[in-house]
Regions:
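C-terminal interaction appendages of subunits in large macromolecular complexes
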Residues: 2-16, 23-31, 191-193, 197-391
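Catalytic phosphate-handling regions of large nucleic-acid enzymes and associated NTPases
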Residues: 2-253, 315-317
Length: 391
């Protein structure tokens, strides 16, 4: 920044009087398409490829860097370590800061209940995915190790099954993909927002996914819906099953699924207890919406609502006024509040660095091809290792 002179002249003294500014005062005319191509597209593709969208192994780069760091730390078989230790080591692969790394760890943990099959075995307060107010503790207070399911993520990774690339400062290497032995891309929910596109892959039952994959390998024309009935969300609740909608999602990778909360009616207390809510919402969003409806006069049957969630699990208690039919009230709440919510599916996955929206059959086809390549590379590695050396 230019400094003011101290000689009292009031003139601004330049730090670099001989500096030359290229095109100073000149307006450069350029087609907007060319400008976008040079400036916007590299940024957009960087977000799409390097951050937001999952790949065929079911992971984004941030997930992969964290889990691989934990694997290298021996946390697949060893005892838990402080989360802060893992975060610090992960920064060798991920330079985006400790807060971003720890937040990724929280979402992958068992304690947060975001995933159907968590990858991180956690100890301590990791918050809850269904509550905005239940914040997770700092990394120095929590402990983690890899969940046993991660054995299937790293199996034979040391046998040249996948490619490795240098990290950001060329001090070490990291895998471009994990040689997963089951279609993780379909087992756990994966959401991401990129530039001009997004991804939202719903989770499915692990046993059904494996059964469907085996059937597909034996017969590529296998009827997918006969073995994979529909999504399976963590946290419970009900899915309003629409077979035609499910078939459309399976075929195109796009669609919407209706999820409904589970509740009990305590007759003695004249109280409705919500014990499970849709995966796509939170306790606070539900309570705020109900209170808003009460203020507007659209809901008059409720005398009090409170959050009774504790270590035993989720619970929203709704006290009813005398003479209110709980079933009729719940039907009204399902229509007006997130107690019934939609989960939008958009199976947008990176294949060879290119985003593609695919149906279940296409995803299975891509995963099987990927897995076949991993097996071939492992076999070649073993053959070369056991090959007798020529004397």
């Amino acid at each position: 920044m230019p400094k003011k002179s101290k000689d009292g002249s009031g003139k601004i003294k330049r730090n670099y009087p001989d500096a030359f500014i290229e095109n100073a005062g000149i307006v450069v005319q350029e087609k907007i398409t060319d400008t976008l191509e040079k400036n916007y597209m590299p940024y957009a593709m960087s977000v799409i490829v390097s951050r937001a969208l999952p790949e065929i192994d079911g992971f984004k780069p941030s997930h992969r860097k964290l889990l691989y760091t934990m694997y290298k730390q021996g946390l697949l078989t060893g005892k838990r370590t402080k989360s802060a230790n893992v975060v610090g080591e992960t920064m060798k692969l991920n330079p985006h800061g400790d807060d971003a790394i720890y937040e990724t760890m929280v979402r992958l943990s068992r304690g947060n209940e975001t995933l159907l099959h968590p990858y991180v075995d956690s100890k301590g307060n990791f918050g809850k995915s269904y509550s905005r107010d239940m914040a997770y503790a700092a990394s120095r207070y929590t402990e983690v190790k890899l969940d046993p399911i991660c054995n299937e993520l790293f199996r034979d990774i040391d046998k040249d099954t996948v490619d490795f690339v240098p990290n950001y400062d060329n001090s070490t290497t990291e895998p471009t993909l994990f040689p997963t032995t089951f279609p993780t891309i379909l087992v756990n929910a994966n959401m991401g927002i990129a530039v001009s596109m997004a991804s939202s892959v719903c989770p499915f039952n692990l046993a059904e996914v494996c059964e469907t994959c085996i059937a597909y390998i034996k017969n590529p024309d296998h009827d997918i819906i006969s073995t994979l009935k529909g999504p399976d969300f963590p946290g419970g609740g009900f899915m309003l099953y629409d077979e035609e909608e499910i078939k459309e999602i399976f075929r195109t990778g796009r669609g919407s699924i209706k999820l409904r909360s589970k509740y009990n009616y305590d007759k003695s207390a004249n109280c409705i207890e919500i014990t499970q809510i849709p995966y796509s919402t939170t306790i606070e969003a539900i309570i705020e919406k109900i209170i808003d409806l009460i203020k507007q006069g659209k809901i008059k049957e409720i005398s009090y609502i409170r959050d009774e969630t504790d270590l035993n699990g989720l619970k929203i208690a709704i006290d009813l006024k005398r003479g209110v039919d709980p079933e009729k009230l719940m039907n009204k709440l399902f229509k007006l509040t997130p107690l019934q919510d939609n989960y939008s599916c958009n199976f947008n996955i990176l294949i060879g660095g290119v985003p593609r929206v695919m149906g279940i059959r296409e995803i299975l086809g891509e995963w099987v091809a990927f897995r076949e390549e991993c097996v071939k590379r492992r076999v070649y590695f073993d053959l070369n290792k056991n090959k007798p050396s020529s004397s």
